[in-house]
């Protein structure tokens, strides 16, 4: 089995090729299709991670600091090589189903391709666990509001429910009609070259996931979507999700203070969508010819605008954007 540093130094195609071989060595019948690897297991839990990172430059050097942090001058890509490595360790002991997606960072492309196949209809699992969350003890459920599932995960892992933005399970849950959670995987400062990984945090998630997978549950957990209450301006959940706080936390390489936000963008999006009003996004990006270039996208929600932008510009990372504005 390759080391974590080895996984970090691979390109996405190299990760896909290696994981196909690795899962095959663990007695999986691996399905390799455009956008994903899928391997059905004996334990009714689907493990999810993505194989791409935001970094253009290949990671060639992994350093270990005195305080136990793993990093790279090229960007270590813990988002989401941590998730891949966690799954590698879990399937050595637990023969769960596995889904590894391509191009999550440019719009959950691989996950969306998977939802258009017949595999999504025949998962035969009770729930899904994704490993694509920063930090060390977060459990993010996004639009899933199945209280029984939320309580089950929190009780078995000891993690705390946290707000999240968007990831592969955000599109997998409604398509599969199954609940899912995204667990912290030990990386920090994602989407920057200052990203680092805390080894023991990643190992703690592996142990927490084992406890969750081994815990008994009563059949599949249905996906119950959060609902937006227009009368009081809130989402039907324990938290009011702020869609962009985690999804787009960087502007010109600097991180916003999360405490500065008062009005969740999610609520504004919902109100705009209800009124069927178009939102326009202007994005200023670097340009080799004219130094700067403006791009324009429109949609019913801010999320829709950003999705179109990243699908059209897969080579652009968010922290390369000079500035942007909605109107």
Feature locations, PLM:
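A non-catalytic alpha/beta surface segment that caps or lines the substrate-entry region
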Residues: 2-43
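Short secondary-structure junctions
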Residues: 25-32, 64-66, 157-161
